Amino acid sequence: MWGLVRLLLAWLGGWGCMGRLAAPARAWAGSREHPGPALLRTRRSWVWNQFFVIEEYAGPEPVLIGKLHSDVDRGEGRTKYLLTGEGAGTVFVIDEATGNIHVTKSLDREEKAQYVLLAQAVDRASNRPLEPPSEFIIKVQDINDNPPIFPLGPYHATVPEMSNVGTSVIQVTAHDADDPSYGNSAKLVYTVLDGLPFFSVDPQTGVVRTAIPNMDRETQEEFLVVIQAKDMGGHMGGLSGSTTVTVTLSDVNDNPPKFPQSLYQFSVVETAGPGTLVGRLRAQDPDLGDNALMAYSILDGEGSEAFSISTDLQGRDGLLTVRKPLDFESQRSYSFRVEATNTLIDPAYLRRGPFKDVASVRVAVQDAPEPPAFTQAAYHLTVPENKAPGTLVGQISAADLDSPASPIRYSILPHSDPERCFSIQPEEGTIHTAAPLDREARAWHNLTVLATELGWSWGPERGWVPLLVAEWSAPAAPPQRSPVGSAVGIPQDSSAQASRVQVAIQTLDENDNAPQLAEPYDTFVCDSAAPGQLIQVIRALDRDEVGNSSHVSFQGPLGPDANFTVQDNRDGSASLLLPSRPAPPRHAPYLVPIELWDWGQPALSSTATVTVSVCRCQPDGSVASCWPEAHLSAAGLSTGALLAIITCVGALLALVVLFVALRRQKQEALMVLEEEDVRENIITYDDEGGGEEDTEAFDITALQNPDGAAPPAPGPPARRDVLPRARVSRQPRPPGPADVAQLLALRLREADEDPGVPPYDSVQVYGYEGRGSSCGSLSSLGSGSEAGGAPGPAEPLDDWGPLFRTLAELYGAKEPPAP
């Protein structure tokens, strides 16, 4: 069993055992010299558990760090020591005979702080273990070889300006890779190298704080602070590292707005409309963002009514605009004060206020050529209806504020009076009727009157220049700009020299319409009605205005023989009643005359008629039949019978018309009408002929009736040369001249059915074939001989085939019979 492990110390005790660890001895068998049962006793095993090696040590040869020895080793050289585990054989080696352990290279604790190995003693000859393996640790002892570092640096921090002393800015943290449990190699102390006196740092925690109060961002916005961390507790010989902290002062609203000048002067033309921008005002505020937002307002003075001020979208500028129309002649300048105020105020900095400023504003109104100004914004005139043309309606008036002596011309825009019902006097502005007015047709007329300034105009040089005035007429379109000194009908700048006004003319009502029935009345009464029964309520209307003689009175037939009576209800209606005795039976309806009149001065009246039929009624009061229908029934024909008779007659007529149309269509398909046979032919040739002989047309009637045809006239026979356009079927040659009519009728029907053949009544133009053709010319001009018109030979036509042989026999020259 192991007896004792001796630890050899090297120079000054730098190497050594950390301590002893006792363990119970194990039973071991007897030796070869003492056979027999083993004697059990308590033995000492390993008495160590760890070694230490200083890091970063590099010597000229492997360094001895310890010695292993077992009590079974008698010094006879039979014991061999083995070392296994982390770094065994490479970092750590052992002498097999002596048990000395050496380290072969420099170690770094930051890479590996300790090594775990196994030691074992075996028999050199048989490698039989003499002892079980035992584990031990070799620790690398730390030295101060790593400076502090800031893994998160450089740092950026923000702190509000004007912060109090000691306000925390940021915490910096350094890291030292040395062993914090051994010595002071990892004990750090923080200091400020650069950034004093504005900032300080806590030596132990690394918290950066403000060192002075009231740091102003507007003076210095950014600071660069250098922080150092030193190990060994900050003592001499320690290693150090540093980092930078960029501290930015954030803005707070600690500065009030300030106008750069105390007086602002602007000018605006008097014609500027509401909303026109006059100018911009800006109060300076060195703060940023929302802390520099401002609101502007007009404090006092005469400008609050004429002008308004608002803040632009960026919240910096004040926009001064026109609030109401300006008038140079009324007021030429305005003076008032404008205040600028911060919208967001921090109560913590109220002591640095007030956060507002005031400036004076003066606005000068510039004169400009103005259009004529009407005395009223709108005019309301009245005129009675039915007045003669030329009746005075009213007068409108406008004045030139720039030059009261300048004349004004008035006109009515045509689109506002399309019917030309009114006219206006150009110089005076009086409006007259141009046609009779009817209130019932149109009660209101809305005119647009144009007032134009003449005599002077605002020229391009912004000066007053004279204009030559020509005869005035209302323009239908906006006038064009005329050169200075030219004769014009309206001013040079119509937009600045003319103005418009609305004139509403009301047509007053007169009693010019007689009352009328509201609708045509056609009613009935039962023949069994009792006397005094109400037949119909009659209503009337008067187109005149309500209240102007529009009340209507009624009066019916008078006298004891009246079949009906009319009772006036005094509310614009009347009741049609039966008289005291029943109405006598009657086949025709009754026409009841009713007189209507109004209460005007003078009163107007009219007569209307109400149709009343006497009918037979059912017991429930419904109509069974009226006397006119009963009269028809007495003749033996009812309404249903009449309708049946009319239907039958119409059906018969339709059948007859259809039969005639079908028969006529069949006849037209079988025969050729005579008027269709009469055709004229216009034949045009390229060369001049011999006169009228060449233009004689053939008689189609003679061709259809060869037996009754007149003998041909002396001279060359006329020919109608038409090239066939459609290919026809071969037909057998007719047996004789008697069948010519049938042949021509067949050819005519084929030509009519062929869509490619032109109509007969057409102009045919033929070319000249020339002498190179074997058949010669097909033109009729060459049909006769030049000598005396003798007929030409028919042999060429015979050569063309059977279709042309028939023509050759008809029109070819025949040999006279032999004597």
From Swiss-Prot:
Residues 46-150, 151-259, 260-374, 375-517, 517-630 form the Cadherin domain. It comes from Homo sapiens (Human). Three calcium ions are usually bound at the interface of each cadherin domain and rigidify the connections, imparting a strong curvature to the full-length ectodomain. GO terms for biological process: adherens junction organization; calcium-dependent cell-cell adhesion via plasma membrane cell adhesion molecules; cell migration; cell morphogenesis; cell-cell adhesion; cell-cell adhesion mediated by cadherin; cell-cell junction assembly; homophilic cell adhesion via plasma membrane adhesion molecules. Residues 45-641 are extracellular. It is found in: Cell membrane. Disulfide bonds: none annotated. Gene3D superfamilies: Cadherins, TCF3-CBD (Catenin binding domain). Pfam families: CADH_Y-type_LIR, Cadherin. It comes from the Eukaryota. Keywords: Calcium, Cell adhesion, Cell membrane, Cleavage on pair of basic residues, Glycoprotein, Membrane, Metal-binding, Repeat, Signal, Transmembrane, Transmembrane helix. Residues 663-819 are cytoplasmic. This is Cadherin-24. The chain crosses the membrane at residues 642-662. Associates with alpha-, beta- and delta-catenins. One of its GO terms (molecular function) is alpha-catenin binding. Residues 1-19 form the signal peptide. Residues 21-44 form a propeptide. Residues 768-800 are annotated as: Disordered.
